[in-house]
Amino acid sequence: MTTLDQAVLTLPFRGTWRAEMSPARRVPSHGTHLFATTYGIDFVAVQGRRSATTRDWRTVLSTEQPERFLAFGRPILAPAAGRVVSVHEGEADHVARRSKFALVRYALTQAKRAHGGAGALAGNHVIIQRDGGGYVVLAHLRAGSIQVEEGERVAVGHELGQCGNSGNSTQPHVHVQVMDSPDPFTARGLPLAFRDYRVRPPGGGAPVAVRLGIPDEGAVVEPL
């Protein structure tokens, strides 16, 4: 590990994505230390400010199909070299929720998901034992998309699967976290950072290159 046990990763995607639930804003980033999510970060694919191709009455009042969202089906890449130690499949991609009404109903079932095991929380996911130390989780992958097997070695940029909306997810996105052991129910979360990416200024202008950092909440980033 590097200074402060910080795992340095590459962004696990191509194109522009918005950082959400960032540890640059607060720790624990997801409001809890449970399931080793202490320093986890979420990324949502965007084009400009839009995360979906369509916005209509369902966006405001109901649920939406995940295929509407730009992230759905996008390749998710290995952010570090290492060995795949866990693959979980078999979770369905459920409907997405941007509506406040749908989000309230979904929040009421949170406790049930927390007791439902790794699949109910992380959905379809891959865990990589990173060569530099730590275990990297890529969560909420698309049903049937995972392309790696347990025991397989992967290089940086190796395609693991596709972004989906499985598990505890309100819209298609990829969740990334690093742990000190492969079991999220007993592991501790470890700090992470990303190398070699660009940040697109919210007011426009030329993207700013970052050699090593943690994307701020709401920052739109893309790999160099």
Where are these regions (language model features)?
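Non-catalytic extracellular/periplasmic "stalk"
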Residues: 1-69
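Acidic, glycine-rich catalytic/binding loops that coordinate metals and/or anionic ligands
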Residues: 4-5, 28-30, 118, 152, ...
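A residue-level detector for short acidic-glycine micro-motifs
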Residues: 21, 45, 86, 140-143, ...
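Short, small/polar residue-rich loop motifs at catalytic or cofactor-binding pockets
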Residues: 70-72, 121-122, 146-147
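Generic structural motif
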Residues: 74-84
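Zn2+-dependent peptidoglycan hydrolase active-site motif and core
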Residues: 83-141
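Short histidine-centered loop motifs in beta-beta connectors
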Residues: 134-157
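Short hydrophobic beta/alpha edge segments that flank linear recognition/processing sites
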Residues: 155-168
